[in-house]
Swiss-Prot record:
Involved in the degradation of L-fucose and D-arabinose. Catalyzes the reversible cleavage of L-fuculose 1-phosphate (Fuc1P) to yield dihydroxyacetone phosphate (DHAP) and L-lactaldehyde. This is L-fuculose phosphate aldolase. Pathway: Carbohydrate degradation; L-fucose degradation; L-lactaldehyde and glycerone phosphate from L-fucose: step 3/3. GO terms for molecular function: L-fuculose-phosphate aldolase activity; zinc ion binding. It catalyses: L-fuculose 1-phosphate = (S)-lactaldehyde + dihydroxyacetone phosphate. Gene3D superfamilies: Class II aldolase/adducin N-terminal domain. Pfam families: Aldolase_II. Belongs to the aldolase class II family. AraD/FucA subfamily.
Length: 215
């Protein structure tokens, strides 16, 4: 797909992320795999003011085009693509319930079968590191090895998928799961969970059932 169309999709995803209540202000960032690198949102520009010309290209060596500044979190986007060859889009936000669970430094367990949408029986919580650092990108790469989404301790959420629509859908789904988890934790701890065997059945069914969006 041509660059301007991808840039427009990135902007639309940012605006939809805000509309869904997953983000606010200039927090969060969105990227898509492009050529040997990626296109990513810039730093410090409110989503409603973004234009296609603001979107930044970063090559496979981590060098961004002149005259533009990418999101400070570009390193963990790059790490996500390196860790997940199947991913073509990454969404990061500071959704309230996901961030609350990340403050507890807990993974989201198999409280609901939709946990399998992230690729396993839980959604991990990557250890804290300062935003924008190589250390954080290393934590992200490890957490995403076997999952499509991870919480970031004291920070937020990352979701990656084959395209932007699926990545945003997954981010929204994880926020709902985080809300369910916190609601259940208010009643009992530990919370009841589905077994690994039950999640394995769901994972198998998800191979032929799920969000149908053109790649």
């Amino acid at each position: 797909m041509e660059r301007n169309k991808l840039a427009r999709q990135i902007i639309d995803t940012c605006l939809e992320m805000t509309r869904l209540g997953l983000n606010q202000g200039t927090a969060g960032n969105v990227s898509v795999r492009y050529q040997d690198g990626m296109l990513i949102t810039p730093t410090g520009i409110p989503y409603e003011k973004l234009t296609e010309s603001h979107i930044v290209f970063i090559d496979g060596n981590g060098k961004h085009e002149e005259g533009k500044l990418p999101s400070s979190e570009w390193r963990f986007h790059m790490a996500a693509y390196q860790s997940r060859p199947d991913a073509n889009a990454v969404v990061h936000n500071h959704a309230v319930h996901c961030t609350a669970v990340s403050i507890l430094n807990r993974p989201i367990p198999a409280i609901h079968y939709m946990i399998a949408a992230a690729g396993g029986n839980s959604i991990p919580c990557a250890p804290y590191a300062t935003f924008g650092t190589r250390e954080l990108s290393e934590h992200v790469a490890l957490a995403l090895k076997n999952r499509k989404a991870t919480l970031l301790q004291h920070h937020g959420l990352i979701a990656c998928e084959v395209n932007l629509e699926k990545a945003l859908w997954l981010a929204h789904e994880v926020e709902v799961l985080a809300q369910l988890y916190l609601t259940t934790l208010a009643i009992t701890d530990p919370v009841p969970v589905l077994s690994d065997e039950e999640i394995a059945v769901v994972l198998e069914k998800f191979k032929t059932y799920g969000l149908r969006i053109e790649e």
